[in-house]
């Protein structure tokens, strides 16, 4: 089948190769001329690795005519603008698969909520997310990876499962808990930032394990707030993606946290990076959410104080350690 990928960065270009491996015809849309040229020359947009039988264009109208299945692989902060253009130019109903992991800071919206707000019902056929522990650096090398396709319409999740699954290296599970999948996938980026800070400060594996455990508690609180399922927290988009993002040197969020821990500011890191670090934006959204609704998310609060208020690490850490005694979980 024909599939259009909206966004030709590391993950978008990698998924294009996955779909081509599965004998689908893929067109990648992006505005980055360098990405387009590399893909059309048979190279990955980011990695120095070949791509086979994939075309790319900067013409959104052509991209929308090419397929009625759109894979959304753009940063969350750009999602609203891209969807507005899609709504304006689409002539037929579309099905969407979101692979972007983040929360919109200005609204606290998950991507599914942005889609439902922007795309008219007459143009919105189906929606799913595709999440889980999946560094593009490994998937493009066809290393075994497991993901979860989540949709409120389980039959559509099953359809996406069949489209993306590859018998050699990619297995897709399904879930009807779309909300939980989206929340977990956004929060794990924030927890990876925090773990990077801990590593840079010389904390050991005991401390990192404690962060993961308490991070899972905060993840469950957020999923509950959004009316998702706790089981999702323990699944691929929750615990699975948290492990890979919080500990891997491939992780942009973990690496950014290390830089924060070494003394760099948020502004310095962003000025030096040419790739999206979703954890920074999601942190703002979750911090504002916990402030507005009085949620008990001490790790979120601490990370925000460190990164955006530039409070000394020692003071923030001491406040965490001096919190009242309580039972676990």
UniProtKB/Swiss-Prot annotation:
NADPH binds at residues 11, 101, 136, 252, 276, 278. Keywords: Cytoplasm, Lipid biosynthesis, Lipid metabolism, NAD, NADP, Nucleotide-binding, Oxidoreductase, Phospholipid biosynthesis, Phospholipid metabolism. The keyword Signal does not apply. Sn-glycerol 3-phosphate binds at residues 101, 132, 134, 188, 241, 251-253. The active site is at 188 (proton acceptor). It comes from Phytoplasma australiense. Pathway: Membrane lipid metabolism; glycerophospholipid metabolism. Its main location: cytoplasm. This is Glycerol-3-phosphate dehydrogenase [NAD(P)+]. Catalyzes the reduction of the glycolytic intermediate dihydroxyacetone phosphate (DHAP) to sn-glycerol 3-phosphate (G3P), the key precursor for phospholipid synthesis. It comes from the Bacteria. Transmembrane segments: none annotated. GO terms for molecular function: glycerol-3-phosphate dehydrogenase [NAD(P)+] activity; NAD binding. PROSITE patterns: NAD_G3PDH. Its EC number is 1.1.1.94. InterPro entries: 6-PGluconate_DH-like_C_sf, 6PGD_dom2, G3P_DH_NAD-dep, G3P_DH_NAD-dep_C, G3P_DH_NAD-dep_N, NAD(P)-bd_dom_sf. GO terms for biological process: carbohydrate metabolic process; glycerol-3-phosphate biosynthetic process; glycerol-3-phosphate catabolic process; glycerophospholipid metabolic process; phospholipid biosynthetic process. It catalyses: sn-glycerol 3-phosphate + NAD(+) = dihydroxyacetone phosphate + NADH + H(+); sn-glycerol 3-phosphate + NADP(+) = dihydroxyacetone phosphate + NADPH + H(+). Pfam families: NAD_Gly3P_dh_C, NAD_Gly3P_dh_N. One of its GO terms (cellular component) is cytosol. It is an enzyme of class 1 (oxidoreductase).
